[in-house]
């Protein structure tokens, strides 16, 4: 794969990025850019992911999209459906699922016997939260742009659990919302036939506690 083009909402910023990274093409028109490439990597704000992905897919271009591919289940399904109809690829960029570390964890699961419980967490105090508390609401804390704790950070816990354990038989969850409706923290419990998996995620508290998977013969601790 060879990066050849960049799109930005302003030509000046596109030109600056292209020069900095040695890209031959720079665009401020998304449609024009998609006509010059074979595939598109979408790393814009979450609220724009679906529209841009659909635009590229409808133009016959493969899409690798930053998480989440859409601000809702319907949007995500719409992108994958558009790709399937055209025989092209739409894929969410979940890099950590394809790392050697993730494979080590997969390989270690049988060593701890029948798994009964797992606690998976990512609690990371956002550097933008202090500004929110002081009255300045930056884009990362604006729910109208498709942003939330689950979309920004909780998705890593969720995809990690689904990769290791598959889909649960049932699930439930609760969230903590800030004054503007932004989801600041959340917790999900996933129930399986013989085990329970708890997920915790936040952009407004910090924790260094590890993720732990407990089996009948031992446990796996992940820092």
Task: Give a label for each model feature.
Residues 157-223:
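Contiguous beta-strand/loop segments that form the cofactor/metal-binding neighborhood of enzyme cores
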Residues 14, 52, 79, 105, ...:
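Aromatic/hydrophobic pocket-lining residues that form π-stacking "cages" and hydrophobic walls in ligand
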Residues 1-21:
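N-terminal Rossmann-like dinucleotide-binding module
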Residues 2-5, 38-40, 90, 147:
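Short active-site oxyanion
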Residues 27, 65, 90-92, 222:
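Hydrophobic residues in well-ordered beta-strands that form the structural core
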Residues 21-82:
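Beta-loop-alpha module in the N-terminal Rossmann-like domain of NAD(P)-dependent dehydrogenases
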Residues 96-169:
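Predominantly a Rossmann-like dinucleotide-binding segment in NAD(P)-dependent oxidoreductases
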Residues 3, 77-95, 114-117:
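Rossmann-fold dehydrogenase core element
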